[in-house]
């Protein structure tokens, strides 16, 4: 057996320096959006009992979970999603809270990825859950919060696609298709494989009811703006399906009325592979990333598995994919704090330290130099992206070097503070 002490497991990643700072900035910005939209942050354990995720509504297949055992032999998992633990917390610790609950989180989730397709095994998700209301107001609030979150990060040209989990269920419930065939049908529609869909429906046409075959056959083609809803209605008389279509229509119109209609579209072929969704579902896309950067929807039956029946809706943003998109768009909108390095002679240590503390209070990144040689100080500063070098070497004015302009000046402390605050 080889020695793996210099490596990390497949699907994991070390995040260093500037990339780490950018990621933290993104997380902080999302937290601000949630906070000022009335959401309260909660934190769940990284390790949960496997039973939390092992119900008849299985969000994540068990083979996608990282499993381990505790000292009593019980199966544990690294949490594969955040919505289910929040359902557990709500059902066990929040029964007496004021509803609707508006919760938010930013946390890492873990999923086994057997395929060598570059997908991460550790993913940072940031999202919200609105718990305790059934009406479309909470669906609209969730989607609008998602749009505002992406806008706050400076992301361009994204789209939130709306679908409805109940639509597919309504169209197939009378067909009584076996579970295996149902999974196959979902996958074909999700992949918009028109040829395979027609072939599949032809093969089962003699065995099952053909009542809604026409609209099912057209589901992959039914995407675009709000006119798609009327086209879909013309293809079915299924009352449950028509209700699902009306829900999407009303949600779309509400978001349009707010003034955010340009960020949404409809995709009636959106069929989720996560079983707990019951109503409107949505995914966020941007050209620079192949997969969805955001996903969410209504899940009214999940929390009952933890002791209380409560409807809910929410979404999760993939922070790692957001970083990729922002980098490719060259639209990092995070504030870049000025960086200062202070070098000093030993007799001026206290003055240098006090000045460093003053600058930190003004949100300027500042450190005392651990090096003494001028060349070493300059090289270190350039490599680390320092903006200004300040020197405490005499009683009079302080040495100041602007590394961008390469200019040198001797200034009073208040003059330096004015310079740094520009």
UniProtKB/Swiss-Prot annotation:
GO terms for cellular component: cytoplasm. It is found in: Cytoplasm. Its main location: cytoplasm. Keywords: Amino-acid biosynthesis, Cytoplasm, Histidine biosynthesis. SUPFAM superfamilies: Class II aaRS and biotin synthetases. One of its GO terms (biological process) is L-histidine biosynthetic process. Pathway: Amino-acid biosynthesis; L-histidine biosynthesis; L-histidine from 5-phospho-alpha-D-ribose 1-diphosphate: step 1/9. GO terms for molecular function: catalytic activity, acting on a protein; histidine-tRNA ligase activity; transferase activity. CDD domains: HisRS-like_core. Disulfide bonds: none annotated. This function is generally fulfilled by the C-terminal part of HisG, which is missing in some bacteria such as this one. Heteromultimer composed of HisG and HisZ subunits. Required for the first step of histidine biosynthesis. May allow the feedback regulation of ATP phosphoribosyltransferase activity by histidine. Belongs to the class-II aminoacyl-tRNA synthetase family. HisZ subfamily. This is ATP phosphoribosyltransferase regulatory subunit. It comes from Clostridium botulinum (strain 657 / Type Ba4).
């Amino acid at each position: 057996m080889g020695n793996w002490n210099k490596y990390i497991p497949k699907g994991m990643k070390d995040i260093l320096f500037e990339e780490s700072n950018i990621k933290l900035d993104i997380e902080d910005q999302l937290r601000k959006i949630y906070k000022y939209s009335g959401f309260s942050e909660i934190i769940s354990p990284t390790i949960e009992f496997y039973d939390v995720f092992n119900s008849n509504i299985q969000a994540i297949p068990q083979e996608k979970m990282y499993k381990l055992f505790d000292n009593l032999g019980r199966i544990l998992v690294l949490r594969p999603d955040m919505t289910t633990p929040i359902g557990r917390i709500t059902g066990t610790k929040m029964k007496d809270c004021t509803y609707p609950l508006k919760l938010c989180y930013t946390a890492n989730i873990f999923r086994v990825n057997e395929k060598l397709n570059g997908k991460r095994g550790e993913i940072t998700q940031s999202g919200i859950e609105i718990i305790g209301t059934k009406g479309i107001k909470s669906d609209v609030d969730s989607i609008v919060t998602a749009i505002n979150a992406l806008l706050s990060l400076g992301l361009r040209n994204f789209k939130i696609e709306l679908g409805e989990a109940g639509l597919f269920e309504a169209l197939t419930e009378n067909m009584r298709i076996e579970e295996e065939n149902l999974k196959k049908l979902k996958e074909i529609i999700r992949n918009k494989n028109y040829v395979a869909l027609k072939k599949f429906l032809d093969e089962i046409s003699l065995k099952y009811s053909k009542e809604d075959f026409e609209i099912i056959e057209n589901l992959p083609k039914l995407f675009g703006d709000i006119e798609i809803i009327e086209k879909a209605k013309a293809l079915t008389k299924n009352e449950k399906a028509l209700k699902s279509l009306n829900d999407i229509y009303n949600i779309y119109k509400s978001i349009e009325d707010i003034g955010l209609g340009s960020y949404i579209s409809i995709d009636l072929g959106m069929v989720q592979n996560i079983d707990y969704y019951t109503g409107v579902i949505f995914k966020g896309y941007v050209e620079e990333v192949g997969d969805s950067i955001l996903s969410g929807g209504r899940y009214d039956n999940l929390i009952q598995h933890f002791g209380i029946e409560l409807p809910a809706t929410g979404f999760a943003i993939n922070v790692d994919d957001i970083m990729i998109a922002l980098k490719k768009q060259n639209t990092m909108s995070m504030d870049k704090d000025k960086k200062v390095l202070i070098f000093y002679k030993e007799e001026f240590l206290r003055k240098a330290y006090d000045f460093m503390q003053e600058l930190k209070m003004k949100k300027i990144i500042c450190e005392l130099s651990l090096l003494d040689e001028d060349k070493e100080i300059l090289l270190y500063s350039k490599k680390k992206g320092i903006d200004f070098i300040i020197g405490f070497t005499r009683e009079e004015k302080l040495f100041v070097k602007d590394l961008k302009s390469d200019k040198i000046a001797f200034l009073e402390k208040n003059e330096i503070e004015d310079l740094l605050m520009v």
